[in-house]
């Protein structure tokens, strides 16, 4: 996608062209298999990587919530074993697994503090559970942080030192790279962009507050407000002229854009890459978001920030998992 501008957005660049690659940082000499896992409220993905970072095998399945965290851990264990043993002789090699989880985590302890889209997930010692089940070293990270690492190393954010990735899918999250280093916050909980309150009298969020971005602009919120089964269904209805669907998408895009504008003001970012299933809602949703970014940000700061579509699609978290293992400054422990 080329340069996209709207009236009044002369200093807001929206691009999709690849950026030049930067020299790769030093890497650990990791022997054996590396498996990345991207755990979401709807889907869980696992991929086995080649030593040079290409995906050799992958598997995707609906998240089996079952009786809670243990059901999901059992499912992840089965998926990881499946992809990691798919290559002849691979079972003899050591393995490292890196997993992204949708909620605040302590990456040092490997504990998931909470995950609003994963029922029953409170203070879950995920690293310990996975290491016990798989018998290998495991790293645990916020899913949007892994996606940010993937996009900054090999996607839209290549060469950008101050970068954020925003995912808008089942839920909404953010990952930050500041001065070329992952920013996790004081306790590892940075990135809960979906719980920025944008409508204090709005719908109740899973976290217990009202009017969170998650509750008004996520895929689940869009579908709920329109009485549909998914945000894609809402987008199809909007394209066909359904006025309710159009109004729901317009409101979600505006809330998201205003929140992004505030993020630009706060962090003086060079680039924000956005991705996730909701952007399948079409150009009107994108344009509405971009317009609201302009309204919600300070022009002097905004002119320095590009907004781009993420480039790695559903692989960004998996690629970020590989980079987390292989790149020293991005390791969780």
Language-model-detected regions and their locations in the chain:
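Short, intrinsically disordered, charge-biased short linear motifs at domain edges
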Residues: 189-198
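ATP-binding/phosphotransfer module of carbohydrate and carboxylate kinases, centering on a glycine-rich
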Residues: 2-96, 105-111, 127-138, 150-160, ...
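Adenylate-forming
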Residues: 147-153, 173-176, 195-196
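A charged helix-plus-loop insertion that forms the helical arch/lid used to bind
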Residues: 110-121
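Short loop/edge segments at beta-strand edges and connector loops
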Residues: 140-142
């Amino acid at each position: 996608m080329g340069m996209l501008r709207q009236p009044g957005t002369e200093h807001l660049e929206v691009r999709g062209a690849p950026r030049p690659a930067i020299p790769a940082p030093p890497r650990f000499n990791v022997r054996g298999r590396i498996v990345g896992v991207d755990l979401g409220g709807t889907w869980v993905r696992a991929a086995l990587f080649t030593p040079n970072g290409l995906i050799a095998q992958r598997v995707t399945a609906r998240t089996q919530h079952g009786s809670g965290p243990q059901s999901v851990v059992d499912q992840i264990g089965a998926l990881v074993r499946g992809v990691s043993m798919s290559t002849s002789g691979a079972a003899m090699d050591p393995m490292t697994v890196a997993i992204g989880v949708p909620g605040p985590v302590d990456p040092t302890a490997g504990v998931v503090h909470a995950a609003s889209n994963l029922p029953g997930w409170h203070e879950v010692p995920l690293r310990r559970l996975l290491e016990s089940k798989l018998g290998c070293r495991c790293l645990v990270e916020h899913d949007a942080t892994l996606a940010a690492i993937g996009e900054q190393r090999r996607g839209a954010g290549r060469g950008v030192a101050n970068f954020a990735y925003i995912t808008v899918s089942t839920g909404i999250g953010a990952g930050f790279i500041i001065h070329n280093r992952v920013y996790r916050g004081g306790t590892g909980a940075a990135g809960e962009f979906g719980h920025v309150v944008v409508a204090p009298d709005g719908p109740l969020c899973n976290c217990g507050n009202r009017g969170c971005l998650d509750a008004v602009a996520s895929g689940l919120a869009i579908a709920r407000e329109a009485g549909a089964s998914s945000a894609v269904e809402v987008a199809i209805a909007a394209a066909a002229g359904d006025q309710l669907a159009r109004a729901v998408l317009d409101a979600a895009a505006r809330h998201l854009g205003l929140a992004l504008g505030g993020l630009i003001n706060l962090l003086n970012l060079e680039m924000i890459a956005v991705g996730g299933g909701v952007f399948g809602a079409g150009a009107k949703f994108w344009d509405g978001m971009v317009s609201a970014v302009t309204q919600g940000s300070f022009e002097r700061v905004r002119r320095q920030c590009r907004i781009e579509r993420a480039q790695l699609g559903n692989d960004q978290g998996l690629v970020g998992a590989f980079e987390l293992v292989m790149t020293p400054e991005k390791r969780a422990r």
